[in-house]
């Protein structure tokens, strides 16, 4: 049984979040019940996003991930739909990273390119977040996936000068220009 007593106050102010967290705690040993609860939670994406932003929600979802492929797929679908909102928050960012790693371990080759495409499509938004967003865009460029790099280059094209004046943004511009020189994409 998972002990989340120390996180009780993080969801106590919002009754809906508290009810979901309590339910997760109650069914944490039953995979079938966790699947039902995961489906119920992700049916309201706003609730899911708010839930995984709390430490209690993060820990609850973290324990459910990896227990079954069905649970992971349910969470992946909501992550795809709410990617920009989840990727810039501390705890939900860790959930996204964990689910990417789970699908990579299972050799599901479709998830990683899909996430890279989402990073590319949201590159401008992500560069506005200096902690996670810029680092994520930089890592996506380092993967050297041509499609992702082209998406990033196109989304940031008219913002190179602005980014070059930012401490971490200049790294992205430098990497895009070096990738462009190597002939991977026309930057």
From Swiss-Prot:
Where does the record say this protein resides? Cytoplasm
Write down the species: Arabidopsis thaliana (Mouse-ear cress)
Name this polypeptide is given = Pumilio homolog 26
Name of the gene this protein is made from: APUM26
GO CC annotation: cytoplasm
Q: What is known of its domains?
A: The pumilio repeats mediate the association with RNA by packing together to form a right-handed superhelix that approximates a half donut. The number as well as the specific sequence of the repeats determine the specificity for target mRNAs.
Q: Tell me the ranges holding the Pumilio repeats.
A: 20-42, 43-78, 79-116, 117-154, 155-187
Tell me, in one coarse class, where this protein mainly resides. Answer: cytoplasm
InterPro entries reported for this sequence: ARM-like, ARM-type_fold
Alphabetized, the UniProt keywords read: Cytoplasm, Repeat, RNA-binding, Translation regulation
Q: GO molecular function terms here?
A: RNA binding
Q: What does this protein do?
A: Sequence-specific RNA-binding protein that regulates translation and mRNA stability by binding the 3'-UTR of target mRNAs.
């Amino acid at each position: 049984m998972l002990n989340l007593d120390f996180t009780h106050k993080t969801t106590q102010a919002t009754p809906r979040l508290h009810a979901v967290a309590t339910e997760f705690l109650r069914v944490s040993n039953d995979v079938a019940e966790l699947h039902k609860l995961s489906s119920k939670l992700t049916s309201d994406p706003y609730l899911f996003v708010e839930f995984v932003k709390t430490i209690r929600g993060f820990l609850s979802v973290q324990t459910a991930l990896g227990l079954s492929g069905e649970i992971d797929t349910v969470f992946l679908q909501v992550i795809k739909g709410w990617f920009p909102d989840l990727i810039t928050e501390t705890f939900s960012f860790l959930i996204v990273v964990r689910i990417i790693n789970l699908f990579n371990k299972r050799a599901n080759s479709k998830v990683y390119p899909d996430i890279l495409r989402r990073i590319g499509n949201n590159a401008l938004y992500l560069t506005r977040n200096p902690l996670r967003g810029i680092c994520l865009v930089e890592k996506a460029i380092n993967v050297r996936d041509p499609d992702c790099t082209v998406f990033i280059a196109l989304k940031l094209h008219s913002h190179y000068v602005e980014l070059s004046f930012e401490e971490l943004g200049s790294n992205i511009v430098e990497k895009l220009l070096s990738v462009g020189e190597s002939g991977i994409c026309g930057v």
